[in-house]
Amino acid sequence: MIDPLLEIMRLLRDPDDGCEWDQVQTFSTIAPYTIEEAYEVADAIERDDMVALRDELGDLLLQVVFHSQIAADSGKFDFQDVVTAICDKMTRRHPHIFGEAEESPGWEQLKAGEREQSGQASALDGVALALPALLRAQKIQKRAARVGFDWPDKAPVKDKLLEELEEVAAASSDEEVHEEIGDLLFSAVNLARHYKVDAERALADATEKFTKRFNLVEASLDKNMQEMSIEELEAEWQKAKASLAAG
């Protein structure tokens, strides 16, 4: 069933009779669309909208086909190579299912083998630079922890977070503030990991909670927020918080 889509993309990229827009696209120019489509898949899942999920998965699949066709046009690889590579990877990572090994190697052993094959020396190699910063921090910390570079429990992680907060307060220049805020955020992600909390999900939930409360405050006011004191705004905020908590 994938063949019709592959043919559509081949025709769109045809140098003579294809679509002018599709013809000139590169990996770099469509990369933002690939990221956007992945987020739209996640959004459809979050909204439990199966019709939208079906459509968004199709859009994401199109991105895979598009990148594969761009690669095929320059002789690098094609869609079948992509499929073969992921099939090989999944088979390699599940020898207890697809192989004859009685005891499967550990996950890190498998990943280390893959990194060696791809020329990656560090346990942190291969974590995509294009990931959202919060998600990339989580992945980097998990990678480091898997090879033993981690605090033994939550207590020193909490201490580190407080230490970073103090360093933010002590910063004396914009550059120092920038750096220390980054360290503070990184430490907060690390604390979330030690509590087995997905920091990305937790921040998304907190942002949505703020949005609901703010919308309620906004709807209840009969004057501009800029005309109100911080005490008045805090009072309205607490009302909105109580209202939402009561259901």
Describe these PLM feature segments.
Residues 1-56, 62-181, 185-247:
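Flexible "arm" and connector segments at domain edges
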